[in-house]
Amino acid sequence: HFIFVVEGVLMYFYEKQVRQLLTRLADRFSGSEVWFDVCGPMMANSKYIKPDSLRGHEAQIRSGLKDGHEVENWEPRLQLIDQALYQKFFPKRWGLGGRLMGLFPGICKKFSSLLGYKIKSLRPVFVRGHPHHLFKQTA
């Protein structure tokens, strides 16, 4: 089993490409975990709000999401472990404004968060000795 950490990468890809990557990881690495950061819709859709790392660069954020459970709909083998808010990490870095914003998770998720997923296996359900078209999730 592996832990994949994909930090600062996926937001630069289109949603379709992110979905493909997550499906390929789920195909090959059952029982593993994948962690990645996402930009929320406020950051992904804004020309004016950018992460510090993009200021002065032409790179574009191409995808973003607010709710980590959305990924479970894309790929049913991914089970959300946590959607962590950056305001919980290193509170002194964020200052008073960031700490206050951290009290409102819904607002924070509009900008960015860290998502962690367990990759579960889907095994076929057998009906009368033949694989059924539906799959049963296993941990």
Question: Predicted segments — roles?
Answer:
Residues 1-123, 139:
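Alpha-helical subdomain
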Residues 130-133:
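Intrinsic-disorder-associated, low-complexity terminal segments enriched in Asp/Asn/His/Tyr and depleted
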